[in-house]
């Protein structure tokens, strides 16, 4: 990829001038100027997903200038490099090929001169056979009972993706109970262990390196719990054989897997260094998804993602959904300086989607050094957050409607509900539509005054409160309407956001696929842990950290 500072491009300077012209425009005026604005600013993917981006502070000129920026930053070349397996993650000297995991046409993809597709296909087939054996009851626990519970132990991408997908696709799940443990807080593991039977539980230890502190702490504790349980009812001499029936590793490090006590040749499902953790649900990390849904639905998830991959790779930029969303995000982040964006899925099964995209985006593009190693003097990744509708409406929408901050929003909703109870879904969608309309157009003082006069309410009294009922509007949003949340459409939606994040990273001139910012905290935690365990050593840090350590030691011994 080319290293181009976006602020030095002609298109960036042109956008700055354009911003001065559009900054005082109201979305309401844009709709008045073009009664066909919806048609001009919407696009459909595979007759399954509709993107309406008309309720944004943009014109055709805005989009054209943003596309010029993408071209000047060589986005087309970057897309090509990623799909071809070039080592675009130069800070770690790695290719970025989560797209290869859903390469449904099986087109050869070379890394260091070797086609990686045979290995991908081998692992996928191994996953399918294994899941079939678990689901159909052929794989037995150490007391010859069927597996009933799956516990996925992992953190970050090894947890958020699989957890989100299994929740989002709950209507498609089978009889297996899926549990997720991520937090190193022992309470998380404790509460899961209370619910399960060691005779019928399968643990998935999910870690690329098999050295992640949180994951391995939980994994060792789970193994110890399991061994303690089986020694009460079985010969301790056979515990390694029993572990082989109840512990599976999902990792790229067979050496550490073996040290833990899992046989890599039989009980490990491999994934590779060119798979980033937050983009890994498509790999063996998604084993919990396949166990929950079955292999057919897992492959439908891959199919949907592949379809979006092809859309992203082949569609012109002005009709390319991930590119459009990415460019609009840059428009607000870097010119309006909005700093944040919110995601609101109006589907309760999708309640973990915002948290998943939060990690994908903020860990990817939360960078302050460009690809040349120089400090950045412009905004990069936004703060991403959200909540499922309509819960958010009764929580923080007040600030979005009448606060002082611009918060661009993505509203996501299915047309068809999996559970159409009475008129619930129509009311849900009515709220979805009402919020996007209210945010964009607001409500003027004159309208509110006229309403009070028409209703013959106490006008003299109400004059005092009318200003508090004014909605300024002009709050931008995208509406993503999905025909139905299925494995296919969810796969496409996830890939859409992945490619949006990639596009923004290219234009920001940063390395999207590393996460060095996570490392310092890990190193310090290891140092501090050793001090916490030794009562006779005084900490030698700053006064704040020293004081907190001393109080922790004092209170923990009380």
From Swiss-Prot:
Entry annotated with the keyword Electron transport: no
Gene behind this protein: pgi
InterPro entries membership: G6P_Isomerase, G6P_Isomerase_C, Phosphoglucose_isomerase_CS, SIS_dom_sf, SIS_PGI_1, SIS_PGI_2
Pathway it works in: Carbohydrate biosynthesis; gluconeogenesis; Carbohydrate degradation; glycolysis; D-glyceraldehyde 3-phosphate and glycerone phosphate from D-glucose: step 2/4
Pfam families, per database record: PGI
Keywords linked to the UniProt accession: Cytoplasm, Gluconeogenesis, Glycolysis, Isomerase
Organism: Blochmanniella floridana
One GO cellular component, as annotated: cytosol
Protein name as it appears in the record: Glucose-6-phosphate isomerase
Reactions the enzyme catalyzes: alpha-D-glucose 6-phosphate = beta-D-fructose 6-phosphate
């Amino acid at each position: 990829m080319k290293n181009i500072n976006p602020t030095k491009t002609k298109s960036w300077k042109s956008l700055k001038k354009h911003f001065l012209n559009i900054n005082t425009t109201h979305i309401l005026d844009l709709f008045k100027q073009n009664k066909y604005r919806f048609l001009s600013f919407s696009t459909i993917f595979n007759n399954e997903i509709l993107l309406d981006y008309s309720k944004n502070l943009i014109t055709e000129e805005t989009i054209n200038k943003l596309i010029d920026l993408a071209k000047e930053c060589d986005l087309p070349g970057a897309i090509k490099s990623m799909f071809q397996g070039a080592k675009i993650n130069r800070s770690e000297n790695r290719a970025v090929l989560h797209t290869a995991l859903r390469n449904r046409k099986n087109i050869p993809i070379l890394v260091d001169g070797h086609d990686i597709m045979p290995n991908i296909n081998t692992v996928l087939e191994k996953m399918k056979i294994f899941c079939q054996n678990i689901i159909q009851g052929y794989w037995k626990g150490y007391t010859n009972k069927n597996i009933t519970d799956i516990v996925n132990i992992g953190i970050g991408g090894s947890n958020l993706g699989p957890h989100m997908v299994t929740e989002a696709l709950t209507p498609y799940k089978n009889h297996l109970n899926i549990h997720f443990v991520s937090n190193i807080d022992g309470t998380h593991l404790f509460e899961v262990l209370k619910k399960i039977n060691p005779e019928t539980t399968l643990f998935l230890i999910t870690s690329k390196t098999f050295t992640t502190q949180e994951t391995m702490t939980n994994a060792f504790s789970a193994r110890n719990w399991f061994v303690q349980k089986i020694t009460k009812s079985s010969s301790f001499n056979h515990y390694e054989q029993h572990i082989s029936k109840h512990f599976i590793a999902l990792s790229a490090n067979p050496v550490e897997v073996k040290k833990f006590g899992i046989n890599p040749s039989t009980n490990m499902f491999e994934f590779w260094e060119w798979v980033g953790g937050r983009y890994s649900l498509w790999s063996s990390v998604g084993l919990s998804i396949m166990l929950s849904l079955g292999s057919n639905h897992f492959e439908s998830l891959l199919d949907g993602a592949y379809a979006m991959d092809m859309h992203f790779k082949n569609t012109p930029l002005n009709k390319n959904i991930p590119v459009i969303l990415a460019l609009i995000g840059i428009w607000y982040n870097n010119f309006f300086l909005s700093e944040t964006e919110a995601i609101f899925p109006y589907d309760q099964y999708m309640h973990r989607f915002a948290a998943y995209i939060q990690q994908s985006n903020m860990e990817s593009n939360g960078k302050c050094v460009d690809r040349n190693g120089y400090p950045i003097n412009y905004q990069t990744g936004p703060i991403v957050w959200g909540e499922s509708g309509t819960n958010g409406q009764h929580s923080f929408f007040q600030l979005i409607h009448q606060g002082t901050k611009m918060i661009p929003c993505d509203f996501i909703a299915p047309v068809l509900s999996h559970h159409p109870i009475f008129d619930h879904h129509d009311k849900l969608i009515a709220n979805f539509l009402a919020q996007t309309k209210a945010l964009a157009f607001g409500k003027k003082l004159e309208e509110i005054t006229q309403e009070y006069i028409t209703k013959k309410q106490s006008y003299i009294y109400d004059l005092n409160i009318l200003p508090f009922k004014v909605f300024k509007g002009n709050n931008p949003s995208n509406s993503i309407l999905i025909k139905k949340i299925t494995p296919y459409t969810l796969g496409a939606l996830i890939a859409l956001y992945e490619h949006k994040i990639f596009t923004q990273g290219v234009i920001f001139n940063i390395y999207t696929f590393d996460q060095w910012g996570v490392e310092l905290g890990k190193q310090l935690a290891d140092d501090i842990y050793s001090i916490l365990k030794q009562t006779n050593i005084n900490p030698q840090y700053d006064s704040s950290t020293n004081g907190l350590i001393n109080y922790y030691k004092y209170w923990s011994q009380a």
